[in-house]
Amino acid sequence: MAVPARRTSKTRKRLRRTHYKLQVPGMSACPNCGELRKAHHVCPSCGYYGDKEVVKTK
């Protein structure tokens, strides 16, 4: 089995791990009602996706 020739320092290990983080989901304003919703998803408040009503809301 392959073994590293040198020990990885704490700094190098931590610098490599700086990119391991959670990403915030892309939010956009609904063109119909103006509420925030996830991009490319049906709006939970009005039920529209683009110009069409996909889900009936009360």
From Swiss-Prot:
Keywords tagged on the record: Ribonucleoprotein, Ribosomal protein
Entry GO CC: large ribosomal subunit
Biological process (GO), any one: translation
Protein name: Large ribosomal subunit protein bL32
A Pfam family this chain is assigned to: Ribosomal_L32p
Disulphide bonds in the chain: none
InterPro entries: Ribosomal_bL32 (IPR002677), Ribosomal_bL32_bact (IPR044957), Ribosomal_zn-bd (IPR011332)
SUPFAM superfamilies in UniProt: Zn-binding ribosomal proteins (SSF57829)
Gene: rpmF
